[in-house]
Amino acid sequence: MSATSTRSSVTRKSSLSKSSSSDKSAKSSSNSSKSPTAASGNKQKMQYTKTRERMVDDVPLPPTHKLTMSEVYDDPKTGKPNFDALRQHFLLEGRIEEAVALRIITEGAALLREEKNMIDVEAPITVCGDIHGQFFDLVKLFEVGGPPATTRYLFLGDYVDRGYFSIECVLYLWSLKITYPTTLSLLRGNHECRHLTEYFTFKQECIIKYSESIYDACMEAFDCLPLAALLNQQFLCIHGGLSPEIFTLDDIKTLNRFREPPAYGPMCDLLWSDPLEDFGNEKTNEFFSHNSVRGCSYFFSYSACCEFLQKNNLLSIVRAHEAQDAGYRMYRKNQVTGFPSLITIFSAPNYLDVYNNKAAVLKYENNVMNIRQFNCSPHPYWLPNFMDVFTWSLPFVGEKVTEMLVNILNICSDDELVAGPDDELEEELRKKIVLVPANASNNNNNNNTPSKPASMSALRKEIIRNKIRAIGKMSRVFSILREESESVLQLKGLTPTGALPVGALSGGRDSLKEALQGLTASSHIHSFAEAKGLDAVNERMPPRRPLLMSASSSSITTVTRSSSSSSNNNNNNSNTSSTTTTKDISNTSSNDTATVTKTSRTTVKSATTSNVRAGFTAKKFP
């Protein structure tokens, strides 16, 4: 709802109130001759003055009742949540009790924790890509892909962030996982982590709709999500892509996934890497190159993909992670098998309400692969950053209140301004008078000596005029703030990033108007490529929190941990080392040790980027 529509509603209300007396008299005089049309018109007018009725009555009011434990877990025999009741309640923007949400999340996490890093799934199955908090499109996805009771599903991650219904997606998918633990599989995406959910919208959404404890429970559950799936022993299904440190499928099985994804390394690559833009038509022979679009991980080439497939006896790699105009993309075929070496699936239609893209799911059955596309579904509107309508309307209310006050004060004439001063005004007058020095008569030749007021009435007039001027200035300031607030919200709504264009605030109102002229309906985003280009900044890994500095500004403290012992379970690393900032590749100690070292900034940077990249950029699979 814009301020324009709000003002028009207020105008209608005021006009109705002004004519209410005349309407009543007309109604009493011509009650017998009143036509049905006039009666319906009066009834329609009166609707605008009823504060308990919704202006847009075709949008149902969200339910205030939160589903209880007995309403969600309504079958004591199965002990499983009623996902149908959850779906219907979430479609109405309803919520559930926090204890119910915690139970769903923890029970789902317990099931995910028991699964391996790479799970085995069999056809027939429906493979789905990114969801990104678009719950109403997730419901449409199940309509297209088939009911979960009779259809196997594999989701490739990115269930949260960017959209405003992320927690509904998590609770609904987790309830399906509890109900169908063997036929519905969930993988981890790059957004299922603390770093991105704090930077984007999921944490804020959890706090607004529930509490921070729900967010913490979700983060623990995300740490349990598997990293990959092997479909029919033919297709490797992951969220991102290949890694220069992963040569075989066994390398995935030995990773420690129960943690926050690091900023580099094989786990990061599985979640963040992308194929080259010119995949299949590369001009270099490098298998991996730095991913400048994401700001982390790598681009992998067609040659790297084909060699990985050949070494692991696979047919293709199925991944998500990148928005696609058609909802999917088939890359260059493998020359050996004649099958696409890489397939990307994206299941969030009209991504961010700006991309205008289709969504797709991949159905694999009887050795036949079908792509089913679908369009977006209507969903309720949320103001940016979950702003409520009262916060949004404060600039408008402030402007109108000060405008009313100025109009009231301007009604007084000059004679009324000096009539009957109150105690506060008298006190202010005394302060004005005592400012005149006592020896003013002895310094008549001193030009700097202030003169006494000509009269009490003139001083009263001047004081009140100054107050009116101050309120008038305040009114103009509120008006400017309200206009700029509307411009900022409009700009955020026109950009896929939800952020203002660079420099939009630097020049004040003029720069905001110029930015709006560049993003008006006449020059709106015309293509998928244009939207993707504007959103590129949000596809990068956000900057991480700065490391703790030591006493010397030229060094930082880092902790390295080396381990040569075998892992406690099949998901931990064996004979590998995990580091917070630097990599320990010596493995000289036979016991677990923690070493504190001081290194320069350049050393840390080279250890985390240059050295790692140089070791694997052109390295082929053994």
Curated annotation (Swiss-Prot):
Disruption phenotype: RNAi-mediated knockdown in neurons reduces activation of phosphatidylinositol 4,5-bisphosphate (PtdIns(4,5)P2) in the synaptic boutons of larval neuromuscular junctions (NMJs), in response to high K+ stimuli that induces activity-dependent bulk endocytosis (ADBE). Under conditions of strong stimuli, the synaptic boutons displays reduced formation of PtdIns(4,5)P2 microdomains at periactive zones and consequently exhibits an impaired Ca2+ response. The modification Phosphoserine is found at S527, S567. Zn(2+) binds at D158, N190, H239, H321. GO terms for biological process: calcineurin-mediated signaling; medium-term memory; mitophagy; negative regulation of epidermal growth factor receptor signaling pathway; regulation of innate immune response; response to Gram-negative bacterium; response to nitric oxide; sleep. Residues 1-74, 545-606 are annotated as: Disordered. Its cofactor is Fe(3+); Zn(2+). The modification 3'-nitrotyrosine is found at Y264. Keywords: Calmodulin-binding, Hydrolase, Iron, Metal-binding, Nitration, Phosphoprotein, Protein phosphatase, Zinc. Transmembrane segments: none annotated. GO terms for cellular component: calcineurin complex; cytoplasm; synaptic vesicle. Its EC number is 3.1.3.16. InterPro entries: Calcineurin-like_PHP_ApaH, Metallo-depent_PP-like, MPP_PP2B, PP2B, Ser/Thr-sp_prot-phosphatase. It holds the Pfam family Metallophos. The active site is at H191 (proton donor). The record marks W392 as: Interaction with PxVP motif in substrate. Binds 1 Fe(3+) ion per subunit. PANTHER family: SERINE/THREONINE-PROTEIN PHOSPHATASE 2B CATALYTIC SUBUNIT 1-RELATED. Calcium-dependent, calmodulin-stimulated protein phosphatase which plays an essential role in the transduction of intracellular Ca(2+)-mediated signals. Many of the substrates contain a PxIxIT motif and/or a LxVP motif. This subunit may have a role in the calmodulin activation of calcineurin. Composed of two components (A and B), the A component is the catalytic subunit and the B component confers calcium sensitivity. Belongs to the PPP phosphatase family. PP-2B subfamily. This is Serine/threonine-protein phosphatase 2B catalytic subunit 1. It comes from Drosophila melanogaster. The gene is CanA1.
